């Protein structure tokens, strides 16, 4: 089974910790391993901070966060209404190395280091940046012996059955 949620947030700094807290709460309720939850929440914070800083658009002063948990996979997408990425500004693998004196790009660099797969693109025809990242989930152990979690496939299924 799976679950997903979508938020439309005002493009203000206070929205970043709100999105992060909602993701952490959803991950905790689903039984996702705390280290994985933290990594995803940090990546989400960086993507939201980028949307707040760069996502000013003529059509909307909001941005959208969508999170999908499906089996062992989590996909998070942050989309804004700003000008989008400059053509040619991002190579296919984003920033394999970040120069020490770089004044921007750290957010995408962090997202890439925390997630399994990252995709950045512009919305077709309307402008706006879209950052999507995926991560394989691990689960908190549920039978009380305190052992760390494996993947849902290793434990015989998804703990999201009750959540979805």
Map each language-model feature to its residues:
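HAMP-domain connector/hinge
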Residues: 6-12
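Short, structured helix-loop boundary elements
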Residues: 13-16, 37, 41, 108
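Conserved short strand/loop->alpha-helix "switch" segment adjacent to the catalytic nucleotide/phosphoryl-transfer site
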Residues: 23-45, 100-102
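A conserved hydrophobic position in a structured secondary element of the catalytic/binding core
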Residues: 11, 32, 135
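Conserved polar catalytic motif of the HATPase_c/GHKL fold
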Residues: 46, 50
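Conserved beta-strand-loop-beta-strand hairpin that lines the nucleotide-binding pocket
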Residues: 1-6, 52-164
């Amino acid at each position: 089974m799976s679950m997903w949620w979508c938020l439309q947030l005002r493009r203000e700094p206070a929205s970043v910790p709100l999105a992060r807290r909602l993701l952490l709460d959803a991950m905790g309720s689903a039984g996702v391993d705390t280290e994985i939850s933290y990594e995803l929440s940090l990546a989400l914070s960086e993507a939201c901070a980028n949307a707040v800083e760069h996502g000013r658009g003529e059509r909307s002063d909001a941005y959208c966060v969508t999170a999908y948990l499906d089996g062992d996979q989590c996909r998070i997408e942050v989309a804004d209404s700003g000008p989008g990425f400059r053509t040619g500004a991002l190579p296919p693998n984003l920033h394999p190395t970040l120069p020490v004196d770089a004044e921007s790009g750290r957010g995408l660099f962090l997202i890439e280091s925390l997630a399994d797969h990252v995709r950045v693109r512009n919305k077709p025809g309307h402008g706006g940046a879209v950052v999507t990242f995926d991560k394989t989930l691990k689960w908190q152990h549920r039978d009380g012996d305190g052992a760390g979690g494996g993947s849902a496939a290793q434990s015989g299924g998804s703990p999201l059955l009750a959540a979805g």
